Amino acid sequence: MGYSKRFALYISILILIVMVAGCGKSDETKEDSKEEQIKKSFAKTLDMYPIKNLEDLYDKEGYRDGEFKKGDKGTWVLYSAIVSQPKGESLKSRGMILKLDRNKRTAKGSYIIRELKEDKNHDVQKNEKKYPVKLVNNRIVLVKDVKDKKLKNEIESFELFSQYGNFNHFDRNEITNISYNPNAPNYSAEYKMKKNDRNIQQLKKRFNLKTSKTPKLLFKGSGDIKGSSVGYKEIEIIFSRSKEEAFIMLTALSSFQVTK
């Protein structure tokens, strides 16, 4: 399998985890062009960051439509993962998905470690390990004990990007490469980050990234731009993505109904 197909497959696997509705309430008008709607959606998604106390989401209402059952407050889904592939190595990711049920006021999820590599026949082999976690007093707690002390500390000290990501400097006028496919429907837009961006420094420090490249911010979504009960909105901070190497931060912050 070629590099581009392999990487696309891997990203699609991650996206399947967060195929839920976009966050926040819509304020787009009928007069807005699709390009303007995408810009607004991009800005609104980034405006959610940071959420230092994740338990605040229990009292925050996300997107709602006619699919929600009466009385269902919904569930927030947060996902963050660093995807890396240093030159000559396999594709790996380490990250967490956390679901905050606003009805039960409980939060459960998993810390997930994945690796994709090609065998001698160029078939992709996937290795995955999941470690159940829960949120207690805004702290990540392992549901089952992990004997590896280094891994245990890594999991319990992990912070989702939504907790420390900060886009108060974001300029909507600098959004470029906006695309929209009405048949899917899906859409995307890019934002060139600056070298002194605090988010870049945070990611390099937290994940020991050794790249000097300035990343771009890629906003991707599917479904109605204004929000829907099916679809997703995702942010990728791409340091590099080529045949030689890949360093990408994936993050999603979305809300959806508990039952249909």
Curated annotation (Swiss-Prot):
Provide the protein name.
Uncharacterized lipoprotein SA0401
Q: Which GO terms describe its cellular component?
A: plasma membrane
The organism's superkingdom is given as Bacteria
**What Pfam families has UniProt attached to this entry?**
DUF576
Subcellular location(s) of the protein: Cell membrane
Covalently lipidated residues (N-palmitoyl cysteine) read 23
Q: Does the keyword Phosphoprotein apply?
A: no
What keywords appear on the UniProt entry?
A: Cell membrane, Lipoprotein, Membrane, Palmitate, Signal
**Would you identify the family this protein belongs to, as annotated?**
Belongs to the staphylococcal tandem lipoprotein family.
The membrane topology noted for this protein in its Swiss-Prot or TrEMBL record is:
Lipid-anchor
Tell me the leader sequence span: 1-22
Q: What is its main location?
A: membrane
Question: What gene makes this protein?
Answer: lpl5
Write out the S-diacylglycerol cysteine lipidation residues. Answer: 23
- Species of provenance: Staphylococcus aureus (strain N315)
